[in-house]
Regions:
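Recognizes extended acidic, P/S/T-rich segments that occur
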Residues: 57, 61-96, 160-190, 331-342, ...
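Disordered, acidic Ser/Thr/Pro-rich linker "stalks" and the adjacent N-terminal cap
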Residues: 214-284, 295-296, 300, 348-349, ...
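Aromatic, loop-rich ligand-recognition surfaces of beta-strand-rich domains
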Residues: 258-329, 361-404
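C-terminal motif of bacterial Sec signal peptides marking the signal peptidase cleavage site
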Residues: 16-19
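Pro/Thr/Ser/Gly-rich low-complexity, intrinsically disordered linker/stalk tracts
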Residues: 21-60, 95, 112-152, 208-232, ...
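Preference for solvent-exposed, low-hydrophobicity sequence contexts
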Residues: 162-183, 198-245
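Beta-strand-rich modules
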Residues: 90-116, 181-217
Length: 404
């Protein structure tokens, strides 16, 4: 009986070894140098600046992957797709038109089949389509540019400015994958200026330039020496006790110019959200934007993008607030906001270099052009990054123009 089991065992081992030998090419990186069969029945779905090529894979065990090769911008580009999929994407075409794409079947030994030539006809690429949607307008301290990007393509929108000596220089580049929106170029003098706006894609293709002439509106930083805190009955204007006792910390710390160490303004831990605080700017301003610095410490970044850092909040304005603290018609909503890490990370994600710069220099928020001129500001915190009951801020800096 033992001899029979021994013989059968040798037989099964021999079968397994033979099977492995038959498939050696599939497991050996150097594999076979025999070219595999071509892919079959290729069809095309054309897209803006790109195309998807679908195909049937050959019944060939020597096939490792499919390679697409095509020429654009006097360069040969290649795209590889494994044998686990039946399609691939070719992209980066500079203009609408017809292009030849060669499909190769590639073996485990990197032997290639004869090419199957497929014609693709990509639509107008996103960088050209977005160029046709650009609209500029003057705004405080610069210009505002609106764009539509329905494909959510990765693009750069550049702004150039004509200098006094007639030389054009780039003053801003806005990178986006958004479906559309606005971006602002700030820090410019309130003089009539020639600008150019163009679009660049990730392959370096440039659109033609939209030339415009705009006169940026005068903008200045609001005078913080005139700011005064208010103690409206329904507000959370009192600060957390340990700060109040040990460091004299209260709302006035929001405009003391100190952004790299305590004290800061932190509301009481016994409060609840949503909550609000109110202050008087001392003068009436047509506001354009503001910078918010949360609790930042050099090298440590404090509680920026965590703890009581406001996540979703609102900015309200008034010229004659009701002294009983009511949120009535004496207040107008200037805008709603969300604090977002430049990296797009969450509360538990490590801060990137961009996040750290935002922590140090503050987050910039735009006040809509149609917002009325106001003297009193009400900051309403709806929730925080750390889902706390309180909020904390180091500094608020507002910009705009005095309004008589």
């Amino acid at each position: 009986m033992k001899k029979k089991f021994y013989k059968y065992g040798l037989f099964y081992i021999g079968v397994v070894l033979a099977a492995c030998a038959d498939n050696a090419d599939l497991n050996e990186p150097t594999g076979s140098t025999t070219p595999p069969s071509q892919v079959l029945n290729a069809t095309v779905k054309n897209l803006p600046g790109a195309a998807i090529i679908y195909y049937d894979l050959p019944d060939d065990q020597n096939l490792k992957y499919v390679r697409a090769s095509y020429k654009v911008d006097n360069m040969i580009r290649t795209v590889n797709a494994s044998f686990y999929t039946d399609s691939l994407v070719v992209e980066g075409f500079p203009t609408k038109g017809e292009y030849d794409v060669e499909l190769y079947s590639v073996s485990y030994g990197e032997a290639v089949s004869t090419p199957l030539v497929v014609k693709v006809s990509p639509d107008t690429p996103p960088y050209q389509k977005v160029r046709g949607t650009l609209i500029s307008a003057e705004t405080f301290g610069g210009i505002k540019v609106n764009f539509d990007n329905p494909e959510k393509a990765k693009l750069g929108l550049g702004v150039i400015k004509k200098q006094a000596e007639g030389i054009w220089t780039q003053v801003y580049m806005h990178y986006t994958e958004a479906k559309g929106g606005d971006f602002y170029v700030r820090g410019l003098d309130a003089v009539t200026t020639d600008f150019g706006i163009f679009v660049r894609d990730r392959w370096g293709h440039l659109s033609d330039t939209l030339y415009v002439t705009e006169t940026p509106l005068y903008e200045e930083q609001c005078d913080k020496s005139l700011f005064r805190k208010m103690a409206l009955p329904t507000d959370s204007y009192e600060c957390h006790s340990w700060n109040e006792v040990t460091k004299g910390n209260d709302m006035t710390r929001l405009w003391d110019g100190i952004t790299d160490t305590d004290p800061c303004f932190q509301t009481k831990t016994t409060t609840v959200l949503p909550q609000r605080f109110t202050f008087d700017m001392g003068e009436k301003y047509k506001l354009s934007r503001f910078v918010m610095v949360s609790r930042y410490y050099p090298g440590k970044y404090g509680n920026t993008f965590k703890a009581g850092h406001p996540k979703h909040f609102e900015l309200w304005g008034s010229n004659d607030p009701n002294p009983d603290g009511s949120f009535d018609d004496s207040w107008v909503l200037l805008s709603e906001y969300e604090s977002v890490k430049p990296s797009g990370g969450g509360v538990n994600d490590a801060l990137t270099t961009e996040d750290q710069e935002a922590a140090k220099n503050g987050e910039n928020f735009i006040i809509p052009d149609n917002a009325p001129a106001v003297r009193y500001i009400r900051f309403k915190t709806n929730d925080t990054w750390g889902k706390t009951r309180y909020m904390h801020l180091h500094e608020l800096t507002f910009f705009g123009a005095r309004h008589n």
